[in-house]
């Protein structure tokens, strides 16, 4: 199995690659972790990971700047239904639009917009930086065996914007930051996490292993 982690100039690429290699090794999964900016290699991969940090519009421009990459993603994920994981802004790009400073079109895979977080508790700072628990709304194989909820493991977040999904069924998990904030989305063969699995220690490694085992 070959897992393509897309290098388009954004994301914690080294830590993501190392986390996927470690999760595969510790789970006894035979996987080649391929950090690549080659659209053809993405198109032929068995699983695809889209990381991302920074501004939505910048990440979209970076993705568009890689020849054939958006086309390869749409063909491989939508038409060929290969398993896909978006991380942080990589998850946000699954949306229809980003509303950060300007309106930017996303990939349009998950109905909804990415908008600024406005916590009900004014003492909570933006961005949210640090550890928070997740609450699973819809069971999904990527959360198999992962303790969640008030007594669950913590995930690591760094973000000022959140995906406001139109369909509640697409929201797999939330976190509480002055109100519910989308922590994970998914439908069909695609999932995305607002938190960083590669920085989320046991929760993150378990989620990555589940993604590698997942057969949508």
From Swiss-Prot:
Keywords assigned: Amino-acid biosynthesis, Cytoplasm, Glutamine amidotransferase, Histidine biosynthesis, Hydrolase, Lyase
A GO molecular-function descriptor: glutaminase activity
GO terms, biological process: L-histidine biosynthetic process
Top-rank taxon: Bacteria
Domain spans labelled Glutamine amidotransferase type-1: 2-216
Pfam families tied to this protein: GATase
The keyword ATP-binding is annotated on this UniProt entry: no
GO cellular component: cytoplasm
Subcellular location: Cytoplasm
Chief localisation class: cytoplasm
Active-site residues, as the UniProt record annotates them: 88 (nucleophile), 196, 198
CDD domains noted in UniProt: GATase1_IGP_Synthase
SUPFAM superfamilies found in the cross-reference section: Class I glutamine amidotransferase-like
InterPro entries listed in its UniProt record: Class_I_gatase-like (IPR029062), GATASE (IPR017926), Imidazole-glycPsynth_HisH (IPR010139)
Subunit structure: Heterodimer of HisH and HisF.
Function: IGPS catalyzes the conversion of PRFAR and glutamine to IGP, AICAR and glutamate. The HisH subunit catalyzes the hydrolysis of glutamine to glutamate and ammonia as part of the synthesis of IGP and AICAR. The resulting ammonia molecule is channeled to the active site of HisF.
PANTHER family: IMIDAZOLE GLYCEROL PHOSPHATE SYNTHASE SUBUNIT HISH
Name of the featured protein: Imidazole glycerol phosphate synthase subunit HisH
Source lineage: Bacteria, Pseudomonadati, Pseudomonadota, Alphaproteobacteria, Hyphomicrobiales
Gene: hisH
């Amino acid at each position: 199995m070959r897992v393509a982690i897309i290098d388009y100039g954004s994301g914690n690429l080294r830590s993501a690659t190392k986390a996927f290699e470690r999760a595969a090794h510790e789970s006894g999964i035979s996987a080649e972790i391929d950090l690549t900016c080659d659209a053809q290699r993405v198109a032929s991969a068995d699983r695809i990971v889209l990381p991302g940090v920074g501004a939505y519009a910048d990440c979209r421009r970076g993705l568009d700047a890689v020849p054939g990459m958006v086309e390869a993603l749409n063909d491989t994920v939508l038409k060929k239904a290969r398993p896909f994981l978006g991380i942080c802004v990589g998850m946000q790009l699954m949306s229809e639009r980003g509303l950060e400073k300007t309106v930017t079109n996303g990939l349009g895979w998950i109905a909804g917009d990415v908008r600024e977080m406005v916590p009900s508790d004014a003492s909570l700072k933006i961005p949210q930086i640090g550890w928070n628990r997740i609450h699973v709304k819809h069971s999904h194989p990527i959360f198999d065996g992962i303790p969640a909820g008030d007594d669950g493991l913590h995930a690591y977040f760094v973000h000022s914007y959140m995906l406001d999904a139109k369909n509640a069924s697409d929201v797999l998990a939330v976190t509480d930051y002055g109100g519910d904030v989308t922590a994970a989305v998914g439908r069909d063969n695609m999932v995305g996490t607002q938190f960083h699995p590669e920085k989320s220690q046991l929760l993150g490694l378990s989620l990555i292993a589940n993604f590698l085992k997942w057969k949508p």
